[in-house]
């Protein structure tokens, strides 16, 4: 599962941010987690997890192509990424 990427403490904060975001559309939390590919240019700055679907996190997603965007990402998909050296790609 995606616990490999996010600690229990980070998950608590991300879920709390997700609940606060549902209650207040103007809620604008700071990033809680930075994930990146060590052998590539991709970076994810995550601010919240959907309290109804713990696999989806929200934040800034930059695949290293010069066009970062804000949106949702699957934590399970991030955990399954492999880099060019065939090792776990996101840390």
Where are these regions (language model features)?
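Acidic, aromatic-enriched beta-alpha/helix-loop junctions
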Residues: 46-83
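N-terminal domain-onset segments
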Residues: 1-40
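Conserved small/polar residues in nucleotide/adenosyl-binding loops
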Residues: 90-91
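Short acidic/glycine-enriched loop/turn segments that link adjacent beta-strands
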Residues: 40-41, 53
